[in-house]
């Protein structure tokens, strides 16, 4: 029997590095004492009114343009209703059917030398939630004896980049995530530190029989805080689903939690549908209607993107593809290389020294 086809889509959440939160004047920063960067707006006190952060809106437009998305002339914020301890308002200000950015793609260079185009369904804006820390000897959620909630992160501007289900292997997923991370870092809209949570990635994965056009039952995986974790979690889930199907079991649509220490996923909850959140338009925030002039000003400010920079290093500097890839993988290496060359170092010598 032919192998089943793996179908993967990624939802990447990006914390923006604005000075203040999305809808209030509280400081946006990592590492402060718990519950110190809070106010009536981000804590959801009655009577407090949100005011959109213009810098954050400019950042999502910049991301959308870099991903070749269409910037919507009219988009709305919605209330996404659900109950959770780290949601002080019991709803999250997000976007539903009218996001800022629609369509688009990201081209990624695969290890075999081929190029994969991954479609971008949408890029939308929302506020982040607070952070819950579960206390247990093992550090596992299901064994927690208590939970602590820090609302410093509540209200931080968050951009969600949703890919099409175009990814066919864990290796492709890892390559896509690296390329997206490099793109976001080059735009200077986020520090994209997965270990600090400023870039978080959820994966939707299903298996389908060969020559089938319909997708299989989708499972969402959460809690992957590195590219390596993403690959490991997807490989485990492929093996788990394959064994289940071979044993005649039915795959359940659910959200699963990745346990890095155990190297396995475990069931967290049933997978929600959009209607479970009872979306409705946010009455306190007007529509986002960026002018064409503002969009073009942002487009003109875009830097050289990672893929174009790699091609230039190979074409004009004579660097090998693998060397160019290392130099462009993070902004610090890129800046160091560019500055070293500006000071007179030969291209190859500078690249060898840095890599």
Place the predicted regions along the sequence by residue.
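Basic, nucleic-acid-interacting segments
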Residues: 1-304, 315, 321, 342-346
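Histone-fold and other basic nucleic-acid-binding segments
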Residues: 318-355
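Short acidic alpha-helix initiation/capping motifs at coil-to-helix transition points
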Residues: 301-308, 314-318, 328-333
